[in-house]
UniProtKB/Swiss-Prot annotation:
May be a substrate-recognition component of a SCF-like ECS (Elongin-Cullin-SOCS-box protein) E3 ubiquitin-protein ligase complex which mediates the ubiquitination and subsequent proteasomal degradation of target proteins. May play a role in the initiation of arteriogenesis. Pathway: Protein modification; protein ubiquitination. It comes from the Eukaryota. Belongs to the ankyrin SOCS box (ASB) family. Keywords: ANK repeat, Repeat, Ubl conjugation pathway. This is Ankyrin repeat and SOCS box protein 5. Residues 278-329 form the SOCS box domain. Transmembrane segments: none annotated. The SOCS box domain mediates the interaction with the Elongin BC complex, an adapter module in different E3 ubiquitin-protein ligase complexes. GO terms for biological process: intracellular signal transduction; positive regulation of protein catabolic process; protein ubiquitination. ANK repeats lie at residues 69-98, 102-131, 135-164, 167-196, 200-229, 232-261. Pfam families: Ank_2, SOCS_box. Disulfide bonds: none annotated.
Amino acid sequence: MSMVEENRPFAQQLSNVYFTILSLFCFKLFVKISLAILSHFYIVKGNRKEAARIAAEFYGVTQGRGSWADRSPLHEAASQGRLLALRTLLSQGYNVNAVTIDHVTPLHEACLGDHVACARTLLQAGANVNAITIDGVTPLFNACSQGSTSCTELLLEYGAKPQLESCLPSPTHEAASKGHHECLEILISWGVDVDQDIPHLGTPLYVACMSQQFHCVRKLLYAGADVQKGKYWDTPLHAAAQQSCTEIVNLLLEFGADINAKNTDLLRPVDVATSNSLVERLLLQHEATPSSLCQLCRLCIRNYIGRPRLHLIPQLQLPTLLQNFLQYR
């Protein structure tokens, strides 16, 4: 019999190994799904004791002790916005910071689904507001990705950090790329660095220009974002010209973008614009027309005031008309 086994082709033996692994995985998955459904059934029926027993035996959940789970009922309740089920599970001792294999917490799920009531319940139960997945994603990132202003505000109130390490996904960049200018405004009001530079993405302003998100570009510029900072040597004006977005090009020029700035290929914004396009004609016209003295004075005054103090312009002893002019209103 051993001789027969040895004479089998190697490929056939290998396929048998893979088939065995697949069978075990499917069996484990079936058991998990069955117990999750059973646990949910007991919760619905109000049998908390039985649901808690399943949780303790299957998920290893006990009060005050961490747990690892591929996908716990707490994750499901948070992702679907089922507040009553969420509270029931928490009262039965489910770990509020239970993580999946990718380190996703129930709070991540609640924010991704824009379920602010579930997010608040989890935070009140002690959820880690700055939990990070293996991809570097935080609950605040998920909230900004979905454009959830309520979750964004809630997380910041509970101590969420708008900026972690420089290479991790940034909520500011995510909001700017998706066009969620209201989330962006909330982040700015909490003091986020609007010029945060992530090497492979650039600044939020550059990302907004690449994504053609006019309202986000305007919000960032109003907040004092550096109009010249982009990605490496590419400026936001390079990005807007490349995307042929006339509105954004006009806005950047109004805020003092350098039309002669060169990227790593020694190309100016007009050089990366589509030939004979409206953007190319606009840039050539601006190049031949000097900025007005009023425009130059406004840029000079804003630079002198500095970004951290731009919000104090309304407190200056100046006529309202001049205050509005300095704030591009």
